[in-house]
Every structure is written in C-alpha cells, then in structure tokens.
Regions:
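N-terminal single-pass transmembrane signal-anchor helix
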Residues: 12-46, 56
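N-terminal leader/signal peptides at the extreme start of proteins
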Residues: 1-17, 80-81
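Short acidic linear motifs
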Residues: 2-9, 25-26, 59, 132
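Internal low-complexity, small-residue/proline-rich segments
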Residues: 40-198
C-alpha cells in the first residue's frame, strides 16, 4: 500500500494567473459582442421616437385643418411701416408655431401673444428660447439654436430654436421669390388637404 504524502493530500485552493486571464478575456469578448446589440437597441428606440414625433406633428396639422379648413400658412408677415403683406416683414411666425395648441403646448402658444408681435420682440424671448422635443429627432446631436442674421449686414438679430422637421415650401428657391411657393407651407398659403394630389 502506498502512502500519500501530506503535500499530495492538500486541496488546491484559488486560481492560477492563466485561469484568471482566461476568464477576463471571455468576459471582454462577451461585452464586445453585446455592446453593438445595446447600441442598435438604443438607435431603434430613437427612430421610434422620431416616428412618433412625425405622427404627433401630422395629427396636429390634421386637427388644425379640421378647425380652420386649411393647413397653417408657411408664415404670415407684413411690412411694419405700411401694414401690407410682405414675406420679409413681421411678425414672421410660421406653421410650427401655429400648431402649438394642437401639440398640447397651449401655455407656450399663449406666451406668443397670438403671434402678433415679431419673433424678435423682447416679449417673445421666453418663447424663442423654448426648444420643443416634438420638433427634434433624438438622433440629432447638433446645437438646437439657429442664429437669425440681418441679410445685409450679417449682424445677429436673435437666436431661434431649430427643428428637424420642415414644411415643404415648394420647388422654387425661397431666396429667389420668398412670397411664392408651390408646396404646402409658403407665404400666406391656404392649402387644404384636398388640394394635395401628389403626396
């Protein structure tokens, strides 16, 4: 009968360095495989949120149309000196401001003093500074403020919140003829849903 030495009978406790490195490597590989899946899930959630924003805006436009029998104008403005309609005049609020009540943004809409004061009026500072998430796609990481400048001098006039969703002015270049468009949202437009035949 052979005798086992005391050293042979001791239990081996702990990990070797190689075993520890193998476990760390396996965990690292698993994380590397799971990270893209997590990022894809986040991107899918952002896309879903973006689609939901478009759905809310579309519904608000439909509710506006049901109320006023027309889609909101691209923008309304007049020459402050003459009071006559002028695409480059004031107040200059566009379609996105006009549908605010239909996006459950009544307090903000009421702050605009019924769109009578110009965008640049100090009383509209609070409204101008408000960035609405419904007008932004979550995948956009850019600055959500746009600087309105005087065209002749390039001097900044004010900052305005941006939107990832634009109304279609038409096929004309807005710079060439700001008062005329063949889309849905142009100066003083009164387009009904029934007027839209091609999309």
């Amino acid at each position: 009968m052979s005798r086992m030495s005391w050293r042979d009978r001791t239990l081996r406790l702990g990990f070797t360095l190689i075993e520890l490195l193998a476990v760390i490597t396996i965990i690292g590989i698993m994380i590397a495989l799971l990270l893209p899946a997590v990022q894809q899930t986040r991107e899918a959630a952002r896309r879903t949120s973006c689609k939901n924003n478009l759905k809310q805006i579309g519904l608000a436009l439909q509710l506006y149309h049901d109320t006023w029998q027309t889609l909101p104008p691209g923008w309304l403005a007049r020459d402050p000196a003459t009071g006559r309609a002028d695409p480059e005049g004031e107040p200059g609020w566009g379609w996105a401001a006009r549908i605010l009540p239909f996006l459950e943004q009544d307090p903000l809409f009421n702050q605009l003093v019924h769109l009578e004061l110009p965008i640049t009026d100090p009383q509209n500072d609070w409204a101008r500074a408000t960035v609405l998430s419904v007008y932004l796609c979550p995948t956009d990481s850019h600055n959500h403020q746009w600087v309105l400048e005087d065209e002749s001098t390039g001097v900044p006039i004010t900052e305005l919140p941006t939107s990832n969703y634009a109304g279609v002015f038409g096929t004309f270049d807005i710079e060439d003829n700001p008062g005329r468009g063949d889309g849905v949202f142009f100066f003083q437009s009164r387009v009904r849903v029934a007027d839209i035949h091609d999309g």
